[in-house]
Amino acid sequence: MHKIYPLIKSTNFPYIERNSLKTIQVNLGYKCNQRCVHCHVNAGPNRKEMMNKKTIDNVIDFCVNNEIQAVDLTGGAPEINKHFKYIIQKLFKKNIHIINRCNLTILEEEGMDELLDFFPKYKVELIASLPCYSQSNVDAQRGKGVFDKSIRILKKLNNKGYGESKSLLLNLVYN
């Protein structure tokens, strides 16, 4: 900002100052159970790049040492990372708020249904992506049946208290 400021000073552009870092977003990997045509990281089932445990430990240390208040987990589908529960458990013990960006259908994949009980236990805030409110549009972008699966999972999350209590936050993003 310091080098560019003289160039924008005459434009009445407001000076930007940064405050302390409070939230970081961490991409746990590019592997995903979906192949969304609009995915900005080109995630998909064939991607192999996943964050390893050593890097996750470095992220946790960074958060503790820099008084980070929230960690926003993303991917691909972050739940696919084999250290997904580990990072949540460690951050929770350090009293760091956890946000998980979820495509919803991952929670119907084999072995993932246990996350429906895991998320509330660790007060994970969920940001669920749904590219549209119509079945035809969602299925066109994400594949046939994705809309119905997403609605099924949303109902299950509601039954676990998400969207029903202030302590279990569920946000839908229209992307």
Describe each PLM feature range.
Residues 2-75, 79-97, 102:
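Conserved alpha-helical substructure of the radical SAM core
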Residues 19, 66, 162-169:
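Short helix-terminating capping/connector loops at secondary-structure junctions
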Residues 23, 43-51, 68-81, 92-111, ...:
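Core AdoMet radical
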